[in-house]
From Swiss-Prot:
Its main location: membrane. The gene is kup. It is found in: Cell inner membrane. It comes from Xylella fastidiosa (strain Temecula1 / ATCC 700964). It holds the Pfam family K_trans_C. The chain crosses the membrane at residues 21-41, 58-78, 110-130, 148-168, 180-200, 217-237, 258-278, 296-316, 348-368, 377-397, 408-428, 432-452. GO terms for molecular function: potassium ion transmembrane transporter activity; symporter activity. Transport of potassium into the cell. Likely operates as a K(+):H(+) symporter. It is a multi-pass membrane protein. This is Probable potassium transport system protein Kup. It catalyses: K(+)(in) + H(+)(in) = K(+)(out) + H(+)(out). Belongs to the HAK/KUP transporter (TC 2.A.72) family. GO terms for cellular component: plasma membrane. It comes from the Bacteria.
Length: 634
């Protein structure tokens, strides 16, 4: 796997030992799927499904859980999908960009793939809301097992833990993050040991590894068994994280962590819970905590809460990262992004995302009240994202001539059948809570599509009223205005049109700088732009330059740092102290007669008005900035 350099980062990246990387991956990647044993088997036998915890049913459910982990995580993600990377990066946003790169420029297929990617991203944000709520709530519910009278305190304690977690986000996770791996590793060892302890009491539970028991369950329960898949899929929530975090740890480390630690420990724990239920069917009320000896109950509650917090942290951090990528690709408005680490570029904090997530997580916990009710809502976001990932992977592989068509067809049939069955099993629970993540997804999707469409209309209007730059400059030189020392940098989305900021500067100030740079910043469909391709400078007239700066969608755009490289190009010697950046600030006026429906126009105006200023996003010093306003009707 190749690595690409970050902007402004000339230091070599030192590689850690494999064991250290694997331990870190366990802490970040597998927190979500690692806390699934807290609620999966309990949900499968909830009154919603009407299943009796008898011998055949228990073995059937366990077999479905085991083979769901094998098919969805081991085969689909670990073996197949993690082979598809965008210069080492994974995740639905990276896969969308990669798939679009295989298509002819301007084709409708790019638009359709973009729609799929946006909706998958919207569902991921919904997952980021439900995961912290259900993980922490399930962990704290262990208090009900230890002390039944504590039931009334479960929700308040859960809210306190979650609020504290979100309040601490602005300080970053660089220090405490080093403990995530060891704590999560201890969690997996602990649940594996508890599983072995219970398996010894009823070793016949090991028969559940035979897929016949899963097939027997389908034959025994018929169509009703499809409903139960809505609970079984909870065992593979977090599978998407293996792919999304591939760029941070590498495919090899994630595969090793899954095969040698996570999968064995999860399998042992699920089988252990099943063994307990075979011996004591009344334990089905909360088989995870019932399977733990009394002396270890409180330590396990503490460890489970820590693991749930770490799982939540991984989703929160992932939401920040995905938001940053979406901003770079133009899917959402610019937001304030703060870097919480001086040594690690990828550690960021996005306040708007943080407080929005906290508000929605609190409403989710209060609205659902317990993990059983929440489980009905959880699966839709997860299975929807997984199915979209599968479709995008198939579209990408179809464009690759090296992939045998027969093999691709077989993979497509199996993966779509499995994902489709899981998605259907969750969507039929619409009135039981599945409406919630779908509503979240539709709302986020609407915001993203409105922003994309609004930006396109805005650029079209500005281009329509614009003047061709190459035609404008010769006329300007015939009667040049007064020149002042220094460099003026005009940010523009279209390098062929005279920037509005330049027109306003000439109209009101009637001066021109010695050097004038028309700067366009472009985000590529790759994670990191190579330093050799970062900067393109084109002299267009005496004292005028057209400059393109390229960033990858995983990078934080730092315009001044990128311009420092211009000293290597003849004619421009970028001096920050003698440079003024000119930015046009558009005031958008909604119109009922063109573009989008008026309600979407007003939504776009609201988002545009609250977007972070360009200087903050591009890291331009405020004392070197001149902002000139213009009105645009869309």
């Amino acid at each position: 796997m190749s690595t690409s350099s970050h902007s402004g980062d000339c230091a070599a990246i030192t590689s850690n030992s494999n064991s250290t990387i694997i331990l870190s991956a366990i802490g970040v990647v597998f927190g979500d799927i690692g806390t699934s044993p807290l609620y999966t088997l309990k949900e499968a036998f909830s009154p919603n499904y009407g299943l009796a915890p008898n011998h055949d049913t228990v073995l059937g459910i366990l077999s479905l859980i085991f083979w769901a982990m094998m098919l969805v995580v081991t085969i689909k993600y670990v073996t197949v999908i993690m082979r598809v990377d965008n210069d080492g990066e994974g995740g639905i946003m990276a896969l969308t960009a990669l798939t679009q790169r295989t298509m002819p420029f301007g084709s409708r297929s790019i638009y359709i793939v973009g729609i799929l990617g946006i909706f998958g991203t919207s569902l991921f944000f919904g997952d980021g809301i439900i995961t912290p709520a259900i993980s922490v709530l399930s962990a704290v519910e262990g208090l009900e097992v230890a002390e039944p009278h504590m039931k009334a305190f479960v929700v308040p304690i859960t809210l306190a833990v979650l609020i504290l977690l979100f309040l601490c986000q602005r300080f970053g996770t660089e220090r405490v993050g080093k403990t995530f791996g060891p704590i999560t590793f201890l969690w997996f060892i602990a649940i594996g040991v508890v599983g072995v302890y219970n398996i010894i009491q009823a070793p016949e539970v090991l028969y559940a590894i035979n897929p016949w028991w899963g097939l027997h369950f389908f034959l025994e329960h018929g169509w009703h068994s499809m409903f139960v898949l809505g609970a079984v899929v909870l065992a593979v929530t977090g599978g998407e994280a293996l792919y999304a975090d591939m760029g941070h740890f590498g495919a090899k480390a994630i595969r090793h962590a899954w095969m040698y630690v996570v999968l064995p420990m999860l399998a042992l724990n699920y089988l252990g819970q099943g063994a307990l239920v075979l011996s004591n069917p009344t334990a089905i009320g909360n088989p995870f905590y019932q399977s733990i000896p009394d002396w270890g109950l409180y330590p396990m509650i503490a460890l489970a809460t820590a693991a749930a917090v770490i799982a939540s942290q991984a989703l929160i951090t992932g939401s920040y990262s995905l938001s940053s990528q979406a901003m770079q690709l133009g899917y959402i408005p610019r937001m304030n992004v703060r870097h919480t680490s001086q040594s690690t570029i990828g550690q960021i904090y996005v306040p708007t995302v943080n407080w929005t997530l906290l508000m929605l997580v609190i409403l989710t916990v209060i609205g659902f009240g317990d993990s059983t009710s929440m489980a009905s809502a959880y699966g839709v976001a997860v299975t929807g994202t997984m199915m979209i990932t599968t479709v995008l992977m198939i579209i990408y592989a179809r464009a690759n001539p090296r992939v045998p068509r027969l093999m691709l067809l077989m993979i497509a049939i199996v993966f779509i059948a499995v994902d489709g069955a899981f998605f259907y099993a969750n969507i039929i629970k619409f009135m039981d809570g599945a409406w919630f993540p779908l509503l979240l997804g539709v709302v986020i999707f609407t915001f993203m599509r409105t922003w994309l469409r609004g930006r396109k209309l805005l650029h079209e209007e500005m281009r329509k009223d614009g003047i061709n730059l190459d035609n404008f400059l010769p006329g300007l030189m015939l009667a040049p205005p007064v020149k002042v020392p220094g460099t003026a940098v005009f940010l523009t989305a279209d390098s062929t049109v005279v920037p509005h900021a330049l027109m306003h500067n000439l109209k009101h100030n009637k001066v021109l700088h010695e050097r004038n740079v028309f700067l366009t910043v472009k985000t590529l469909k790759i994670p990191y732009a190579a330093n050799s391709e970062r900067l393109k400078i084109e002299p267009i007239s005496n004292g005028f330059y057209r400059v393109h700066i390229r960033f990858g969608f995983m990078e934080t755009p730092d315009v001044p740092s990128a311009l420092m490289c211009s000293k290597d190009h003849a004619g421009i010697d970028f001096d920050p102290m003698h440079t003024t950046f000119f930015v046009s600030r558009e005031t958008v006026i909604p119109s009922a007669n063109r573009g989008m429906p008026i309600w979407r126009d007003k939504l776009f105006v609201l988002m545009h008005r609250n977007a972070a200023p360009a200087n903050a996003f591009f890291r331009i010093p405020g004392n070197r900035l001149v902002e000139l306003g213009t009105q645009v009707e869309i």
